[in-house]
Amino acid sequence: MQKNKIKATLQAGGSVLGTCITDCLNPEIVIAVKAAGLDFFFIDGEHARASLLDVQNFVRVAKSSGVVPLVRVPQSEYFFLAKTLDCGALGIINPRTESVEEVEKIVSCMKFPPKGRRGYGLRSIVTDLDFKGAAAEMKSADEESMVIIQMETQPCVDAIYEMVAVEGVDATMVGPFDLSVSLGIPGDFENPIFWKAFDRMVDACNKVGVAPGVHFGSTKMLKRAQDHGARFLVCGTDMSVLQNGFTALVGEMDIRSDEPATAGKSGGYM
């Protein structure tokens, strides 16, 4: 099975940087991700339209490019968790995780017996037709796959110390917008309430060797989160990178300076 370089880096105390794929579902984009020097990407299966076929196509290119493919699933159901791994993802990001019981369920669905209850269905996308035997393949899959839980609600903030202490959790990823909404301060990332919750998550992670993480839409905010201790770092989306690049191109060429912009700033994680 493909080695998970970002898992090894995080376990050694390092930091990793990636982005989110939402709309540009041509796997050629993985080549650009690699060329840019990013460590990983995650396909958004919660909010966007990506299918398991898209996941598998991206995984094929990622494996040959040395980029780590992750997927955010819609919810913590066995079907989504296990089948996404069977399609070759090296890690799962689970949204809106809120309790110890849910974390235990996620780990159980993602790990083979005796650690969990994942069914054996390792396909060529995982083994590359180089079968080493069931025991060896299951051991490798358990070792290389990543469990990443999202902190996006007040209940998660309240239970975060117990949640990240569940054996098998590798990293967290704060969803800033959902978290700020749950905290009663929608989109207000200057509010100390937000950073108090964020720092609580970082402290909880550091106590048990889990990598604290976040997905922000700008490098400015991501650097701020990094200063607060985040190490699993995600910035922007495919569409935000395209828009920012095109906007910079138009601004630098300055051939239509008398014409007003046709669109405002993109929102959310854009």
Annotate each PLM feature.
Residues 79, 91-167, 261-270:
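Conserved anion-binding
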Residues 91-105, 172-181, 230-249:
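Glycine-rich phosphate-binding active-site loops on the catalytic face of alpha/beta enzymes
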Residues 52-86, 108-115, 139-142, 190-213, ...:
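Alpha-helix-loop-beta-strand connector modules within alpha/beta enzyme cores
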Residues 31, 35, 76-90, 94, ...:
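Catalytic cores of alpha/beta
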Residues 1-69, 75-76, 108, 147, ...:
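Conserved N-terminal beta1-alpha1 strand-loop-helix module at the mouth
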Residues 18, 41-42, 93, 173, ...:
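Conserved beta-strand positions in the central sheet of alpha/beta enzyme cores
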Residues 1-20, 129-143, 199-200, 206-207, ...:
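N-terminal amphipathic alpha-helix/helix-capping segment at the start of soluble metabolic enzymes
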Residues 237-241, 245-270:
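Extended, intrinsically disordered, low-complexity segments
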